[in-house]
Amino acid sequence: MRKILTFAPILCFCLIQCLNKSESRFPVDLVLELKNAKSKFKIGTDNRTYHWKKNPGRQSGLPLSRKWENTQITFNTNKEIFLNHSLDAIYFPPGQEYQFTLPKGKYKFSSLVGLLGEKEFQPSVSGKLKLYTQSQILEEWDFTGAAKEQWNKKETLVTLEGDLRLVWESKDSDLYIGEPLLYPWEWLDTLVSAQKPKSVILIVIDSARKDFIGAYGFRHSVTPNIDQMAKESVFFENPFANGNWTKPSMMSFFHSEYSSNLGLGNSWFSTKPYQRKVYYGKKRDNLAKTFREAGYYSKTIMNNVFFLDYTTVGLDLGFHNSYQVGMDIVDTEILTNHAIEFVTEKKDIPYFLHFNLNTPHASYSPPPEDMKVVRSIIPDSEFFRYESPVQRYLGEMHYTDREIGRLVRKLKELGTYDETMIIVTGDHGELFSPEHDYSYHFIMQTRFGHGETHYDEEINVPYFIKLPKSIVYNIGKNSQIRISGQSSLLSLAPTILGFLDLLPKNSTYQGVDYASCIRNSTPCPKETYIYTEGRMSESVRTENYKYIRRYPGFTTVRRTSAGEPHTMAEELYDLKQDPKELRNLSLGTEGEILLQQARADFRNENFLKRNGLRIWIPPCEETVCRDFMSMSVQGSVYDWVAPPTVQIASGSAKTISVTKESKDRKGSNASSQEPKQDLSEEIILRTVNPELGAFFQFTRNGKTIPVRFGKYGLEFQKSMTHIEDLIVSERQPDGLYASPLPWVYNDGAFSGSGESEVQKEMGKEVKKILETWGYIHE
């Protein structure tokens, strides 16, 4: 059997996958088994608020009454480099026990264990962790005198008789068992005796422009290691990010869905409570979660905080282990060293590693030795044509490539390179052209930065996939496989999972699975429209044109930060005639036909899901009615639909004013019978942010009048600022068009009302009560 496996890599891979599927889950991830385990104490609240670097685990499926039993907790294990080491852990307050029902057999128990005191300034921590099966003690670890906020590796071999009980004996100390995994001995033996497992490394280079990489046509060999790997890969010739800065881009390619459609918006760093509610409240497939559920060990090594939930910036995607270095400049070598340690330690098991290097990102501070190499590669006559920041950027790209080369050499030394899938991409590019220097509203200037524009130099990134040799052999390709035409990073997750036969059925991944067409030697689908989000802006790119749109309230731009402001709500570029995007055709009549086509394509594709604030303005019952309404939303205004009789002006990203003048309409709707829907009296204000609440004030002929809200038409004399629970109605409220007062409701088309069937039934009773109290007037 071992000889067959040695010479049959495809058979071996299938066997490993079959073992994973037939034996419940191998390795056994105790965090994911928590929901079926018995716990001595249910822990539904945060017992240690003084240690704020933590959050309840988001992937274990625990009920609210037990949610803190799984804690994603971070220890600052090296304060000099701001090293935040976060693990998905099982939480043990003093005296806590957990009992798991598991298949009988021999296992390797593996974990990282950390301690905290019950009190913040407690001088010492201590306790004993005991492992039992059927009342028989398997292992005991004494933590007397252990250091706080440090991770300690604990492994042991155990033979289970159908259960595993973990007992924490302590008077005043908390225990966190991070990444607790049980590896079946037979499964490990299969991996050792057969070929190396197929592991996956996703290398994300922050701010990597495609056109500064040799594989994409840069004339000088600044990135030799990346270029060599590209020759062995599925190579996307013209790939684009779906976000022009890190957060919306990485969230989109990890989930194969646009950031705003995940509930996260695109405007700023923070992730607000309601955005978290929408994100965590729906089924969300992502790379870390899918690999973990398939039995892979999952880790991120990075210098950004977007995968750390406690920061209020990031989210918990379900990694076993997150290693984040916050110190800039020195971080790259530290992260690479840790990645080398990781691939060495985990060489015998399948893993998914997200390796994120921040190096090319500003402030462009390459080591002198890398600048020296770049100077030797590029002739002076060409090198000095670049401005100083671009020269340093080239040094950073060489430094990044050098570090990636170190990791690749270690994989080859370990004998794991051939069967490791390696993906190289960038989260976005970087803007260098002075012609594109528009500064808008945020903390960084546009030039030598990103996040403000949608020109190709800011969103055109490298993207290629080095396949395991056994997969290459299976599909009969021995050289680079090129994907022509434009593509997007929305395809990244379904494509790499497709090659590994791990794409879940009925998944939420939206992008193209290129693995299918490559394996079947059929023409690959064309990504006709590529949509990209920016801060309060968006774009759609085809092979022929680029259309850019800014949200209302964000249409004023400046040429350089000190320049004169001017309005530029739209941009349009003919990419066939103007590939450098220098002539904005939206400003004159020359591009009118193309502009109408681009707008229509943009509307018809419906890239984003949106909530609709629906506003009913009642008919005028006086000789003349001058209606005015001021309104602000918690997120940002995306667009609106209004009849010609209504004038709308935006005061900022979050506020608009509505003005309507009408003459007497007495008799037109005088019947007690409710008329058909009259769109001429309805305004729809759309938002992509998931927050439902808003602020309104309505006057008719200078007099403030009450407004009705939500499904019940609750009437308020004064404007309100927090009406989330009252304003939502997933259908048109009863009596809307017969109302003599303005009526506002949020259709929750994106966020949803979040009501259960029980809550809906309760709502009927609430409506009756409110009617008897006089709050609802049909």
Residue ranges and their predicted role:
Residues 1-2, 111:
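Generic recognition of well-ordered secondary-structure surfaces with a strong bias
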Residues 83-94:
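Non-catalytic, glycine-rich low-complexity segments
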Residues 18-77, 92-103, 107-110, 114-128, ...:
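Catalytic domains that recognize anionic headgroups
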